[in-house]
């Protein structure tokens, strides 16, 4: 079951890379983001067959946020946010 979760995350990552390539930014024109606006907690669910107890154990301490450009240190890309408020990347830690 752990392999299924990992495989699902990798598939979502591959789809995201194909769907929206990240634009290259120049270091001089890079603007600082406002942390309060983009930090939105998102609930995550795993669909499909499997033991609900296992799914609860996997998601128990998982905290996810919709980010605009990239995940913060310690977070990983887990998919694409369904809300389209300028934050398409789903980052979880």
UniProtKB/Swiss-Prot annotation:
Q: Could you tell me which cysteines form disulfide bridges?
A: 64-92, 66-81, 71-91
The record's subcellular locations are:
Secreted
* Tissue occurrence: Small intestine. Not present in heart, liver, spleen, kidney, large intestine and colon.
Signal peptide location in the record?
1-19
UniProt GO cellular component terms: extracellular space
Q: Which UniProt keywords apply?
A: Antibiotic, Antimicrobial, Defensin, Disulfide bond, Secreted, Signal
Supply the InterPro entries for this chain.
Alpha-defensin, Alpha-defensin_C, Alpha-defensin_N
Which residue windows are coiled coil? none
Q: What is its main location?
A: secreted
Pfam families (alphabetical) = Defensin_propep (PF00879)
The Gene Ontology biological process terms listed for this entry are:
antibacterial humoral response; antimicrobial humoral immune response mediated by antimicrobial peptide; cellular response to lipopolysaccharide; defense response to Gram-negative bacterium; defense response to Gram-positive bacterium; disruption of plasma membrane integrity in another organism; innate immune response in mucosa
Q: What induces it?
A: By hemorrhagic shock.
Q: Which residues form the propeptide?
A: 20-58
Q: Record's family? A: Belongs to the alpha-defensin family.
The protein's job, in short, is: Probably contributes to the antimicrobial barrier function of the small intestine.
Name of this chain's protein: Defensin 5
Organism for this UniProt entry: Rattus norvegicus (Rat)
């Amino acid at each position: 079951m752990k392999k299924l979760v990992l495989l699902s995350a990798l598939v979502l990552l591959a789809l995201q890379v194909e769907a929206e390539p990240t634009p290259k930014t120049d270091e001089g024109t890079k603007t600082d983001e406002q942390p309060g606006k983009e930090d939105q907690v998102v609930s995550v669910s795993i669909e499909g067959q499997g033991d609900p107890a296992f799914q609860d154990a996997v998601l128990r301490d998982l905290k996810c946020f919709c980010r605009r450009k990239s995940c913060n240190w310690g977070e990983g890309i887990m998919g694409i946010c369904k809300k389209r408020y300028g934050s398409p990347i789903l980052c979880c830690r």
